[in-house]
């Protein structure tokens, strides 16, 4: 799996470079032509460059010392905490869903250490990720992970109305480490986490999460 330690996720480099080049080009052209319109475009591209730097930021995070703690895979707001019968695990599980707005960090992190036993990408629709249909009908990337103790959990990157580009660095059979970066979704999206049904949730609806740090629950 790619190990990104750069302060900006490399998926953002084409956007940043492109907008920065357009900023410079329009500024130089505006100076030569004395064009207020081109100056306006230059200012717009400069703002888009700054927004891209902000959107693709990739801050360092430190997981809690408790090795039983399952951490949030994304920055955002908890929109689902429920035990559901239909899951990627094939049985009832505790489901915790996190909504990422366009203003959240969009780098995704591994909730718990373990081995990838199943990795699937499912084409689908692009409902708003706050719509309950998005979990089972939207395009998504699903990882089923098995811990060293044999417990299984799943975490799902869900594409949304605007976010239509899922990036997942993980590979089948790979060992993942809790808190490490494993993917990204562009421009607003959702992460679903499925835990064993006996896990007690440590977050509630409306709570804000920090990827790699906020504890969602603890495995027994």
Curated annotation (Swiss-Prot):
List the catalytic activities from the record: a 1,2-diacyl-sn-glycero-3-phospho-L-serine + H(+) = a 1,2-diacyl-sn-glycero-3-phosphoethanolamine + CO2
Entry GO CC: plasma membrane
Q: In which pathway does it act?
A: Phospholipid metabolism; phosphatidylethanolamine biosynthesis; phosphatidylethanolamine from CDP-diacylglycerol: step 2/2
Question: InterPro entries attached here?
Answer: PS_Dcarbxylase, PSD-A
Keyword annotations from UniProtKB, A to Z: Cell membrane, Decarboxylase, Lipid biosynthesis, Lipid metabolism, Lyase, Membrane, Phospholipid biosynthesis, Phospholipid metabolism, Pyruvate, Zymogen
The residues responsible for catalysis, as annotated, are 189
Residue positions where Pyruvic acid (Ser) is found in the record: 189
Class of the enzyme per the UniProt entry, highest EC level: lyase
**Keyword Lipid biosynthesis found:** yes
* Compartments in which it is found: Cell membrane
UniProt cofactor note: Binds 1 pyruvoyl group covalently per subunit.
Q: Which cysteines are joined by disulfide bonds?
A: none
Q: GO molecular function terms here?
A: phosphatidylserine decarboxylase activity
Report how it sits in the membrane: Peripheral membrane protein
In this chain, the site described as Cleavage (non-hydrolytic) is at: 188-189
Chief location: membrane
For biological process, the GO terms are: phosphatidylethanolamine biosynthetic process
Could you say which EC number(s) this protein's record lists? Answer: 4.1.1.65
Co-factor(s): pyruvate
In which domain of life is the source organism classified? Bacteria
The protein's role, per its UniProt record: Catalyzes the formation of phosphatidylethanolamine (PtdEtn) from phosphatidylserine (PtdSer).
Among NCBIfam families, the record links this protein to: PRK05305.1-2 (NF003678), PRK05305.2-5 (NF003685)
PANTHER family given in the database record: ARCHAETIDYLSERINE DECARBOXYLASE PROENZYME-RELATED
Kindly state the subunit structure of this protein.
Heterodimer of a large membrane-associated beta subunit and a small pyruvoyl-containing alpha subunit.
Q: Which family does it belong to?
A: Belongs to the phosphatidylserine decarboxylase family. PSD-A subfamily.
Q: What is this protein called?
A: Phosphatidylserine decarboxylase proenzyme
Q: Which gene encodes it?
A: psd
